[in-house]
Amino acid sequence: VENKICGMTVSPLTERGRQQARKLGEAVKASGVHIDEILYSPLSRAADTAMAIAKATGLPARCEPRLREQCFGKYEGTPRNGGEFRVSKTHFADRYSGGESMMQLAQRIYNLLDELRADTDKTYLLVAHNGIARVVQSYFYDMTNEKYAAAGIKNCEFVEFTF
């Protein structure tokens, strides 16, 4: 893949991505971890991954709009290592031109996690994006700006968090 900022851009799974999703579904089923429901981002790359997991596990799956990736505005589709973007992403409170700020993203995800935390009788599998994973990690762990910037997960990585 091209190492460009996808954000809200429609970017379907590649064949490799579909294979990873099928393998993840098998791994989730084999893990023995109790899961009640899959919640997934409305973006097709996450939705297709969630459907592959649901097919392998038999778990119900529901679209959760708050799990959509951050909107990077004018930076959508540009190289991740672009100088202007690298500087902009260090300004957490500033909204990307035509997009949303890191603070807005964090509020959206923290509100969702607070709701899931209050639903104590259920366990959820979230299928989303690396930017969302970073915010989820910051919900559970204290992080410096540097640790936050370096945080994330691999494609189709299965990570468990407990409230």
Where are these regions (language model features)?
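Generic hydrophobic alpha-helical segments
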Residues: 24, 28, 105-116
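Phosphate-handling substructures
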Residues: 11, 54-110
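Active-site-proximal alpha-helix that buttresses catalytic centers in soluble enzyme cores
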Residues: 1-59, 100
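Short beta-strand scaffold positions
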Residues: 40-41, 107, 127-128
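Short aromatic-enriched loop/helix-cap "lid" or pocket-rim segments at secondary-structure transitions
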Residues: 1-4, 50, 73-77, 139
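Catalytic metal-binding/acid-base residues of hydrolase active sites
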Residues: 44, 67, 131
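Active-site-adjacent alpha-helix immediately C-terminal to a catalytic or transition-state-stabilizing loop
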Residues: 47, 55, 110-163
